Amino acid sequence: MVTIVPYSHQYLKDICQLIQKDLSEPYSKYVYRYFVHQWPEFSFVALDNDRFIGAVICKQDVHRGTTLRGYIAMLAIVKEYRGQGIATKLTQASLDVMKNRGAQEIVLETEVDNEAAMSFYERLGFCRYKRLYRYYLNGTDAFRYILYPN
């Protein structure tokens, strides 16, 4: 049975391994720690019984001195568990916390050629906001997506 639980330090190694394998951007362990040590309440993991199968890493802080902004930094699901709604449940858990804590907007970036991610976030209500040229280390452009919570 798949459950969504709040981030706990015991999952940091699993998160690092999954994201390094699945996402194109090479993050150091310090990037993960930056998010989960300062804003652990916004990150969640998915478990199948006790097996780690996915995570969403997020934060929320003041943007440009005026706007309380949530940010989805990373989302990854173990390959054989994709297509089962787990990413939606993880993301929704983070969105709910951000909304409850007063987020005025929630943003994320994804590669311009990642059709699956763009479709996923659009289904959750995100709108394409702008193109970020050569955003990723590999030179790929990104689209920034934004959601204005109700």
Curated annotation (Swiss-Prot):
Q: What lineage does UniProt assign to this protein's organism?
A: Eukaryota, Fungi, Dikarya, Ascomycota, Taphrinomycotina
- Name the chain's protein: N-alpha-acetyltransferase 30
Q: What sequence ranges are listed for the domain N-acetyltransferase? A: 2-150
Q: Does the keyword Ion transport apply?
A: no
Q: Name one GO cellular component term.
A: nucleus
Superkingdom of source? Eukaryota
The alphabetical list of record keywords is:
Acyltransferase, Cytoplasm, Nucleus, Transferase
Q: What is its EC number?
A: 2.3.1.256
Q: Which reaction is this enzyme known to catalyze?
A: N-terminal L-methionyl-L-leucyl-[protein] + acetyl-CoA = N-terminal N(alpha)-acetyl-L-methionyl-L-leucyl-[protein] + CoA + H(+); N-terminal L-methionyl-L-isoleucyl-[protein] + acetyl-CoA = N-terminal N(alpha)-acetyl-L-methionyl-L-isoleucyl-[protein] + CoA + H(+); N-terminal L-methionyl-L-phenylalanyl-[protein] + acetyl-CoA = N-terminal N(alpha)-acetyl-L-methionyl-L-phenylalanyl-[protein] + CoA + H(+); N-terminal L-methionyl-L-tryptophyl-[protein] + acetyl-CoA = N-terminal N(alpha)-acetyl-L-methionyl-L-tryptophyl-[protein] + CoA + H(+)
Family under the similarity heading: Belongs to the acetyltransferase family. MAK3 subfamily.
